[in-house]
Amino acid sequence: ASVVAGIRDRAPDARILVVGYPQIVPQGKESCDALPLAAGDLPFARTVNEGLADALAEGARRAKAEHVDVYALTEGHDICSDDPWIAGRDTVPGQALAFHPFAAEQQAVAEEILRILRD
């Protein structure tokens, strides 16, 4: 909220969007080589992932900023999916650092931001 307040102080007429956090951890009960977690640890990791996304959404709401729901946008593209938008534990040279988004995720987020701004 303090970051949004700082932006509002400097640019009172700005339209402020808070970009959310993506789905990283699979919803299923199994992990994969790219996300080497024990099956028993997946629910906790999922809770942390959801918590980060929820915290950004709630922070945007409290600050009266718009929220870009990247969590919903990236559903089905977690690290263990057939079409991951986030790199796993290994850096993919020329594409993404470990646990960072691929270009497909960034493109989807950019398109969603444009959609919101045009509304």
Where are these regions (language model features)?
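Active-site rim beta-loop-alpha module in soluble metabolic enzymes
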Residues: 19
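Catalytic His-Asp segment of secreted/periplasmic serine-dependent ester chemistry enzymes
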Residues: 22-119
